[in-house]
Amino acid sequence: MKIHEYQAKQLFRKYSIPVPEGLLCTNLQEVKTALKSLQLPIAVKAQIHAGGRGKGGGVKLGKTATEVVQYADDILGMSLVTAQTGPSGRTVSKILLEEGVSIARELYLSILVDRERACITIIACQDGGMNIEEVAASTPERIGKIHINPLIGPRSYHINQAREWLNIAQEQARAFSLFIHALYKLFLDYDCSMVEINPLIITEDNQLIALDAKVDTDSNALFRQRELQKMHDPAEDDPAEAEAAKFNLNYIKLSGNVGNMVNGAGLAMATMDIIKRAGAEPANFLDVGGSADAERIENGFRIILADTNVKAILINIFGGILRCDILAQGVVQAAAKVSLQVPVVIRMEGTNVKEGREILAKSGLSLINATDLNDAAEKISTLLTD
């Protein structure tokens, strides 16, 4: 789960991680009130769950009260488009006003779960304020990775490595060590998948301050994170993903043209590869799960069809706990309730596959059967090129 920058900084304050003084505002009256307690210049920062806000015009520095109010008026209610929002953008309903600070250097620092190495990794780079993915692609040698055994935690040599990567002076070693330990503790305490500071700044008087803050947490751990549950912002959820969650469907909306429905995350990933192989792009990730019933299949089908970008659908099921006849019943129910305007390719094997195929054959639906994954890829490719 993602939280807003202002919420991440609330957590930072709990762990004595330095952040600028700031106030959250949702309207111009609150902005005018905030100006009475904040010192100029003031940064006006849009609060949405996406990076690249500055490039999209969602972060402005006001040097006078008049400028701050004007920038706030411009940003509140705007549809902010960044590389992470897609062309439709996100509507800004909250802004963070923060006191400006004197910046001597901008750095990048993050702690994340490294799934390839099965450890926690500190990422350090001197190119702060930039898109770290762009730096990794163009100059990967500038990024330091310090791998930490989660059973042991960060040791002094780990922190020294990070400090050297960031070229932080020896005089700041103790402050930096306290900073890392606090950040790491926050990371563990809140079941985070990533904590990112971009930029981490060194001020002209040699203070370390988190100018920005991003905290992503493991949604599977939310049952024990009541504080984070309260930080969830439904307005930032994708409507289709929110609808899918009501039916316990693991759905992630993507930007492609082929919808897919699969049981099992691994098979879903393989199916997305097959779609790419066909020269198309997946429109979603949808794992209906092993215990799905006809109603859940129907709802998954309906959610896929609600995406106007979908030009074809690939259903790939290996019947086990989810029997093929149950899948077929769900598809038939869904087709009876929605207007099926796109071709559907079905590949299913496993438990009750014969019964499932009979149900589909008797339904009268114009469905395209595939014998295996390669056949499914060929049929999808043919459909999209005809």
Swiss-Prot record:
Look up the record and name the cofactor or cofactors this protein needs. Answer: Mg(2+)
Q: Which residues are in the ATP-grasp domain?
A: 9-243
GO biological process terms, alphabetically, are:
succinyl-CoA metabolic process; tricarboxylic acid cycle
Reading the lineage from the top rank, the first entry is Bacteria
Pfam families under this entry? ATP-grasp_2, Ligase_CoA
- Catalytic reaction annotation: succinate + ATP + CoA = succinyl-CoA + ADP + phosphate; GTP + succinate + CoA = succinyl-CoA + GDP + phosphate
List residues binding substrate.
N263, G320, I321, L322
**Cellular component annotations (GO), alphabetically ordered:** cytosol; succinate-CoA ligase complex
Which EC class does it fall in? ligase
Is ATP-binding one of the keywords? Answer: yes
Task: Cite the PROSITE patterns for this sequence.
Answer: ATP_GRASP, SUCCINYL_COA_LIG_3
Q: Which residues bind Mg(2+)?
A: N198, D212
Q: What does this protein do?
A: Succinyl-CoA synthetase functions in the citric acid cycle (TCA), coupling the hydrolysis of succinyl-CoA to the synthesis of either ATP or GTP and thus represents the only step of substrate-level phosphorylation in the TCA. The beta subunit provides nucleotide specificity of the enzyme and binds the substrate succinate, while the binding sites for coenzyme A and phosphate are found in the alpha subunit.
UniProt subunit comment: Heterotetramer of two alpha and two beta subunits.
* Family indicated by similarity: Belongs to the succinate/malate CoA ligase beta subunit family.
Return the protein name: Succinate--CoA ligase [ADP-forming] subunit beta
Organism field: Desulfotalea psychrophila (strain LSv54 / DSM 12343)
Lineage from the top down? Bacteria, Pseudomonadati, Thermodesulfobacteriota, Desulfobulbia, Desulfobulbales
